[in-house]
Design a protein with these regions (language model features):
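Lipid interaction determinants
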Residues: 2-153
């Protein structure tokens, strides 16, 4: 018996131009007033891998995250745990693409933020000059995260 994610991947519609390995160029945020800021610091790091069946793995990290003073993951302070969580975003599952309306749908199997597990998240996207960019749905405060990725292969 196939898991629901595996069954979904078999029927997945993937834009062939998305398949490959992408490195993060920018993780910005568009504020309601039209200004733009850095969501994961000045030099965010990340990797997005999408295979030909639509399976994906995505990681975004703030490069400037401080190390835990104790050196022990189980003994961090409240501030250290907050920085670790807020300085990263990771999830995996399958992704499908509506190539007419230019919408990516991430079918999230697991995520660093547990509330996303089992969710489908839609993002408008474009590919131009070897770069993939997409906009995440607005946050409760109106901010719109924007991710920009550059193809590695």
């Amino acid at each position: 018996m196939l898991s629901s994610t595996a069954a979904h991947a078999d029927a997945n519609t993937i834009d062939a131009s998305l398949v490959g390995t992408w490195t993060l160029v920018a993780a910005d945020v568009l504020h309601p007033d039209g200004s733009r800021g850095r969501d994961y610091g000045a030099d965010p790091k990340g990797l997005l891998v999408i295979d030909e069946r639509g399976y994906y793995s995505l990681q975004i990290f703030k490069a400037e995250r401080p190390k835990f003073a104790s050196g022990d993951k189980a003994r961090g302070t409240s501030d250290e745990y907050r920085e670790a969580v807020m300085g990263s975003s990771t999830h995996y599952g399958t992704v499908s693409a509506d190539t007419v309306d230019r919408i990516l749908t991430f079918h999230i199997q697991n995520a660093s933020f547990p509330n996303w597990q089992g969710e489908e998240q839609r993002r408008s996207y474009e590919i131009k000059g070897g770069e993939l960019s997409y906009r995440v749905s607005p946050r409760p405060n109106g901010d719109v995260p924007i991710s920009v990725w550059k193809r590695l292969n």
